[in-house]
């Protein structure tokens, strides 16, 4: 079985292909016109120091300690002429933030689509000009697709799979893309809606987008967990913890690696709760934050106003090898406090045996997991503060939650489960 994974936002395709290859599937990844550092195999698996350029890393200038990207990871570019005429379908991972910051747009999208549904009974159909806009890329994609039994297309790439796969079935892999894009009155929105409907299967990784799937009238979808390798993300000793304890004379290490967007992540709630932990409880705690996101300056200003600078440590965005060190050095990992669902931070930290505090909507996840994860739920500043106090005052409780967290990941979120679900889908589609 030969499967091409098209697109590689956040290394999801790379991780899935690795899992599938362990199971004997000949899975390749095609990443074209997108060289972001977090979409590169080196970011996921290499051990290196320093901080490569975010948009166009020069790996030949970095000591990767012997790591070489696998031959099955293919980096390509469309011809300049084609690239100039074809819209770049996926602009990154920040579309959702625009909506959260602009609730009027939420209302506009909802009203517009509701009226169109009432008037026509269906969503807007693609226009002929929509197809002409991407037709120039046809021969490149058809050449890339040759020889594969099936295409798994990520983000907005199902559009290209729908239009240019000649006879192969395709699977659409949704990782946040369904929240907004299909409801746009745009070429991408119209074509993506059609591509989801024409897909052999739509794999959903974010439980909350089931409402989007239902609005689109999809019946061909199923849930699959985010690809996280619990054989790599696991409890292990690290010198980093001793270094942090000795340098800051701390007895509690809190780690919050999420990017800074207050509306989406609730970073301000976390910072204020941490200030209360220091001042009201007197914990000699430190908070480690990641220096990335649109509102880093805003977070820094709040930290300054609360006089927390000496006990807040900033790190640059961490490659995955370093990230595992920080997970294992921490007593508690904190994720987001607004959305009610998790991305990769939560399962990565859980796989490392750490208790995780986040806003978790159990109801949204009931269709996905037979057993809810043993996370520590918190949505408000006071609830975050309470969870911090609980894990700091009862280390036995924190350790038990961490152990249960890893056990849950192995059982309900492990790499083998993720691979087996995809293989089951492929076999079903190829037997039709």
Regions found by a protein language model. Give the residues of each.
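A short, active-site helix/loop in glycosyltransferases that binds the activated sugar's phosphate group
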Residues: 160-162, 181, 197-232
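Conserved donor-binding/catalytic core segment of Leloir-type glycosyltransferases
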Residues: 203, 237-265, 271-276, 288
């Amino acid at each position: 079985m030969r499967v091409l994974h098209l697109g590689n936002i956040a290394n999801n395709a790379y991780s899935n292909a690795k899992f599938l290859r362990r199971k004997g599937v000949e899975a390749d990844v095609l990443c074209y016109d997108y060289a972001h550092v977090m979409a590169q195999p080196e970011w996921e698996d290499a051990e290196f120091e320093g901080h490569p350029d975010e948009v166009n890393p020069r790996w030949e200038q970095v000591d990767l300690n012997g790591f070489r990207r696998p031959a099955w990871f293919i980096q390509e570019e469309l011809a300049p002429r084609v690239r100039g005429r074809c819209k770049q379908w996926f602009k990154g991972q920040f579309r959702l933030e625009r909506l959260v910051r602009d609730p009027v747009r939420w209302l506009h999208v909802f009203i517009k689509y509701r009226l169109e549904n009432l008037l026509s009974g269906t969503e807007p159909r693609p226009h002929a000009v929509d197809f002409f806009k991407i037709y120039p890329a046809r021969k490149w994609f058809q050449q890339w697709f040759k020889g594969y039994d099936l295409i798994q297309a990520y983000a907005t790439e199902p559009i290209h799979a729908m239009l240019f796969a000649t006879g192969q079935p395709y699977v659409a892999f949704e990782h946040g893309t369904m929240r907004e894009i299909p409801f746009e009155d745009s070429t991408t929105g119209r074509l993506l809606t059609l591509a989801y409907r024409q897909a052999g299967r739509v794999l959903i990784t974010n439980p909350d987008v089931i409402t989007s799937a239902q609005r689109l009238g999809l019946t061909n979808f199923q849930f699959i967990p985010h690809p996280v390798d619990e054989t790599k993300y696991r409890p292990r000793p690290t010198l980093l913890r001793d270094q942090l304890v000795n340098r800051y004379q701390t007895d509690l290490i809190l780690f919050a690696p999420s990017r800074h967007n207050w509306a989406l992540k609730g970073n301000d709630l976390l910072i204020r709760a941490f200030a209360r932990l220091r001042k009201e409880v007197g914990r000699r705690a430190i908070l480690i934050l990641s220096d990335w996101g649109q509102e880093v300056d805003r977070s820094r200003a709040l930290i300054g106003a609360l006089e927390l600078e000496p006990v807040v440590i900033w790190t640059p965005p961490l490659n995955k090898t370093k990230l595992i060190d920080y997970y294992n050095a921490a007593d508690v990992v904190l994720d987001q406090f607004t959305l009610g669902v998790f991305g990769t931070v939560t399962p990565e930290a859980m796989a490392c045996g750490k208790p995780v505090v986040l806003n978790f909507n159990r109801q949204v996840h009931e269709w996905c997991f037979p057993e809810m994860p043993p996370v520590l739920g918190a949505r408000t500043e006071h609830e975050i503060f309470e969870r911090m106090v609980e894990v700091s005052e009862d280390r036995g409780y924190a350790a038990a939650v961490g152990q249960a967290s890893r056990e849950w990941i192995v059982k309900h979120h492990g790499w083998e489960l993720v691979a087996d679900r995809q293989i089951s889908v492929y076999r079903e589609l190829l037997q039709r």
